[in-house]
Regions:
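Structured beta-strand-rich core segments of catalytic domains in phosphoester-bond hydrolases
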Residues: 86, 92-171, 177
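Active-site environment of divalent metal-dependent phosphoester hydrolases
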Residues: 94-96, 122-124, 180-182, 221-227, ...
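N-terminal, active-site-proximal structural segment of metallo-dependent hydrolase catalytic domains
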Residues: 15-105, 115-119, 125, 196, ...
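Bacterial Sec-dependent N-terminal signal peptides
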Residues: 1-22
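Active-site metal-binding loops of divalent metal-dependent hydrolases
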Residues: 31-34, 92, 177, 218-220, ...
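Active-site His/acidic residue clusters
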Residues: 42-45, 168, 172-187
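Second-shell loop/turn segments in exported
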Residues: 52-62, 83-89, 116-117, 147-149, ...
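Metal-dependent phosphoester-hydrolase catalytic domains
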Residues: 200-214, 221-322
Length: 322
């Protein structure tokens, strides 16, 4: 039964018109503290996630996570008949982690390019993007540091990567917005500030090219009905609404699903698109407290569990406009 839990959303109608052969497959995943096992002296989180740190994050545990994560990507490839063209990631320590992940798993067989910048985040985690170099040409990339009350925020940068596909540019934007730690009301203004930054980035791209192709993805730490998403109205289309209306989600808290990982696309980017949430058995574990199933995370508090992430990965399938 669990093996059938692939949640479909026909946001552009049906599968018709989004054939696999001519589609773009994008994957996004919050990797839950994807740290190296060495203490590089980059802050308290880096020290905790080391062989002798509080989390006892050993080489073996790191490679278990790498293997399970690559298994998930390969499952996506098998299910859709192709490897993901783009993989957006968040909660990644640094580019070295990504190189190790690619070099030591089956993902190394694909020539993925890595785009990553170190941010000023307090936890020492960043966003990143992988792209299939056989299908895309690198054009440029940049990061924008969100500001709140006139000061740079100690949070994740917003990553924008422009890639060329068949002579046409596509702008991929990767986000990881502030959490609700400390309370939703108290933390809300910071999420609003980051969302405002995202809207400004998209507006700037659109002003330079009114037919700009934009795909934004990320962990937005809010459900699709959050007021902050009104800032993107008229610029990007939320691909997660139908899933959310059916009660689906990417993270489970106290027995309730929240859909905080999403894709947004500009109207000019595709003639059809739909989003799915990946809930295959090896990424899930039984919820003994609230019944049902939940994501198989790496840690529960300080206790090592052995999974990949407390988030389910999401995929976006699009047929591009010519």
């Amino acid at each position: 039964m669990l093996g059938l839990m692939i949640l479909l959303s026909f946001l552009s109608g049906t599968f018709t018109g989004c054939e696999k052969d001519d589609s773009l497959l994008v994957m996004f995943w919050n990797m839950e503290n994807f740290f190296d096992y060495r203490d590089g002296g980059e802050g308290p989180s880096d020290k905790d996630f080391s062989s002798f740190g509080k989390r006892r994050w050993t080489k073996r545990r790191f490679h278990v996570k790498c293997d399970l994560a690559s298994k998930a990507v390969m499952w996506v490839a098998d299910h859709y008949g192709k490897m993901p063209d783009i993989i957006g990631l968040c909660e990644v320590e640094n580019a070295n982690v990504l190189h190790k992940w690619l070099d030591n798993t089956l993902l190394g067989k694909i020539d993925y390019g890595i785009v990553h910048y170190d941010s000023g985040d307090r936890r020492g985690i960043d966003v990143a993007l992988l792209y299939d170099k056989s299908r895309f040409g690198y054009v440029h990339s940049s990061v924008t540091v969100p500001r709140h009350d006139g000061e740079a925020m100690k949070t994740r940068d917003i990553l924008e990567v422009c890639l060329d596909r068949s002579g046409k540019n596509i702008h991929f934007i990767v986000n990881h917005h502030p959490s609700k730690f400390g309370g939703a009301i108290r933390s809300g203004p910071k999420r609003q500030s980051v969302m405002k930054t995202l809207a400004m980035i998209c507006d700037s791209i659109s002003c330079a090219d009114r037919n700009a192709r934009i795909v934004a993805m990320g962990d937005f730490n809010d459900n699709p009905d959050g007021e902050q998403f009104d800032m993107l109205e008229g610029i990007l289309v939320n691909q997660s609404l139908a899933l959310y209306e059916r009660g689906e989600g990417t993270i489970r808290f106290q027995g309730k699903w929240d859909l905080i990982d999403m894709f947004f696309v500009s109207p000019s980017v595709s003639i059809c698109s739909y989003m799915e949430i990946v809930k295959v058995p090896f990424l899930m574990v039984r919820d003994n407290t609230y019944t049902g199933f939940k994501p198989f995370r790496t840690y529960s508090g300080p206790r090592y569990i052995g999974g990949v992430s407390d988030h389910c990965p999401i995929v976006l399938i699009m047929k591009m406009k010519q």
